[in-house]
């Protein structure tokens, strides 16, 4: 289990709070009006192969996708220690700063069909968080993210980080989702292929 997902959000107050991804909205997205679209940029680790992504993950599972909901995530910070030990020590974050650093996410419920690796159980449901979604009439789009609910496949292979308290996200938005067709697995349409592993059977033997 990961101790904490850690993304960096840059807010109006220019305080930087360490929460794996670095995320910031585009500079002109300050106060978007209802009906507008805001593009969010995020940096994720890249693995270059399915095998490397699987090795980095806490859980690798085949799932059926269920309903989703919108959520707002706020950065958390640790102000313990001295200024030299911890750059967050002594940083005064106002409610306005915290609101400016909030990130819109889509949280999707998935049902576990098969466990390739990890501690999850077949038949259980978990929630997977992805950047982007809609909030107050504004659509937020993270450029490399394909929301689970939009993928046209009855089953998906998800390569997940576990942050505890039932919180999961993909190791990255492109390499963390694979389309399942029978025993075969493939990258999302438009995503460069990582052909080192092409089937669930190969994954089972590897795990």
Indicate where each model-derived feature is located.
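Netrin-like (NTR/C345C) domain of secreted extracellular proteins
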Residues: 2-14, 22-35, 96-98, 122, ...
């Amino acid at each position: 289990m990961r101790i904490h997902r850690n993304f960096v959000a840059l807010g109006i107050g220019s305080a930087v709070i360490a929460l794996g991804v670095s995320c910031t909205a585009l500079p002109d997205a300050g106060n978007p009006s209802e009906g507008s679209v805001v593009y969010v940029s995020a940096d994720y680790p890249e693995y270059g192969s399915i095998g490397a992504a699987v090795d980095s993950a806490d859980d690798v599972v085949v799932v059926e996708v269920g309903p989703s909901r919108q959520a707002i995530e706020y950065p958390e910070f640790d102000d313990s220690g001295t200024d030299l030990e911890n750059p967050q020590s002594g940083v005064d974050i106002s409610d306005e700063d915290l609101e400016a650093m909030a990130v819109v996410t889509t949280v999707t419920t998935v049902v576990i069909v098969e466990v390739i690796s990890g501690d999850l159980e077949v038949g259980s449901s978990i929630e997977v968080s992805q950047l982007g979604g809609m909030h107050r009439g504004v659509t937020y789009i993270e450029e490399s993210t394909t929301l689970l609910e939009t993928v046209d496949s009855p089953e998906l292979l998800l390569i997940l980080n576990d942050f505890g308290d039932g919180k999961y996200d993909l190791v990255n938005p492109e390499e963390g989702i694979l389309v399942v067709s029978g025993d075969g697995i493939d990258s999302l349409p438009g995503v460069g292929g990582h052909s080192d592993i092409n089937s669930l059977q190969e994954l089972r033997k590897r795990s």
